[in-house]
Amino acid sequence: MGRAMVVRLGLGLLLLALLLPTQIYCNQTSVAPFSGNQSISAAPNPTNATTRSGCSSLQSTAGLLALSLSLLHLYC
């Protein structure tokens, strides 16, 4: 019973190590200093949209990996 608990704790820490960096990376925003010569545009930044969609797919992939490992651990 002690070994199973250690294995579950290790798996939990591994999942945390996999998911935490993706959360930190996806929540970072870059702020550009405002200059009086620049006009404010209402159009979205295409590079920002690409980064967000890539981040979303990375999160879903990490989530699927976590779910797969959890199910594997339960049934094996």
Curated annotation (Swiss-Prot):
GO terms for cellular component: cell surface; ciliary membrane; external side of plasma membrane; membrane; membrane raft; microvillus membrane; motile cilium; plasma membrane. The keyword Transcription does not apply. Keywords: Cell membrane, Developmental protein, Differentiation, Glycoprotein, GPI-anchor, Lipoprotein, Membrane, Signal. InterPro entries: CD24. Glycans are attached at N27, N37, N48. Its main location: membrane. GO terms for biological process: apoptotic mitochondrial changes; apoptotic nuclear changes; apoptotic signaling pathway; B cell apoptotic process; B cell proliferation; B cell receptor transport into membrane raft; calcium-mediated signaling; CD4-positive, alpha-beta T cell proliferation. It is found in: Cell membrane. It is a lipid-anchor; GPI-anchor. Pfam families: CD24. A lipid is attached at S56 (GPI-anchor amidated serine). Belongs to the CD24 family. May have a pivotal role in cell differentiation of different cell types. Signaling could be triggered by the binding of a lectin-like ligand to the CD24 carbohydrates, and transduced by the release of second messengers derived from the GPI-anchor. Modulates B-cell activation responses. In association with SIGLEC10 may be involved in the selective suppression of the immune response to danger-associated molecular patterns (DAMPs) such as HMGB1, HSP70 and HSP90. Plays a role in the control of autoimmunity. This is Signal transducer CD24. It comes from Rattus norvegicus (Rat). The gene is Cd24.
